[in-house]
Amino acid sequence: MKQSIFRYEGHNYLVPFLIISSLFFMWGFAHGILEVLNPHFQESFHISKTMSALTQAAVYGAYFLMALPAGWIIKKWGYRRGVITGLVLFGIGSLMFIPGSKINSFYFFVLSLFVIGCGLTCLETSANPYTTVLGHPDKAESRINLSQSLNGIGWIVGPLVGGQLLFSGVNIAIPYALVGIFVLSVALILSRITLPDPRRAHEADTNGKIEEKPMHAMAFSFGMLTLFLYVAAQTGVNSFFINYAEESIHIE
């Protein structure tokens, strides 16, 4: 009989997996729409390209500052509460675009994006390993790959939807308000349902032995450097590609 990737020890984790996987799409969407904000803010607030890069600096700066606190939250309260914390911060930051559109302050939008970045940090740190325990351990790779595919779709849909809305005169608060309502609704759902504790599964797999000094592992150090360079290249290209397309290739 073919083994289900969502069933384990008599439990079916399909619904929780679908809920968690939807979050992969949402943070991909959040990153995708971020790239559209640069030219939008340049036009709306008459700021330079360099100044508009504060949008990326706010989000990815939050990743740098919030990474260790996110790990502390997970260690103390578990992955489930880490996901919920990330969703709440993500939702609050998104809803902050509503007063931001009234105040019409670029720096308030930057603050909103920083809060969103803090939420995304908690969310990504928690949700990635969460998918690995929502079913049979032997199928963990299949589940996380499936979830990550939705993240890629979010990256594609984000700029398409964002560009269509923002450059057609729609209030910038509308797409973010809808995202905020959705993620806060998911946070409420997750707070009401029972899910497994990934920490217990991890401790069982490692016999309670956890590497306390990962920086001493060369593979970890090189992996971290690779991620740093990859994100730097990706962000640098994505942030100003629309400007490049308009000014150099004359695409409108």
Task: Name what the model sees in each region.
Residues 112-149:
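Cytoplasmic helix-loop-helix junction between adjacent transmembrane helices
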Residues 88-103:
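C-terminal ends and interior cores of transmembrane alpha-helices
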